[in-house]
């Protein structure tokens, strides 16, 4: 539920940024632009949270630190990987402004949503299996 609201808020901000807001600050940004690729990375990070943290927590239900630190490390690595492509020649299109390369952006967003849904369902099922084995 919280992930859904966060993703909805991010989607609204991305659409607002892609359609209405246009400034030199956004055009000369060295980091990732607010576009559908960035939104797909948010879906991926939430999927990783569900897999690494939630899945790891329900293995023991009392060791919260290890899955949290593991998720933070994985999240940082994914963020670095997501920020890198638009600095690599030939991959600049993932950092498109506005509706430039919209088909690529939508395909990347669709991939992020599918990965999020699959990983979340698998993580949920695994967490339920682990939770049944835990003696609380």
Regions found by a protein language model. Name each.
Residues 2-136:
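Hydrophobic alpha-helical transmembrane segments of membrane proteins
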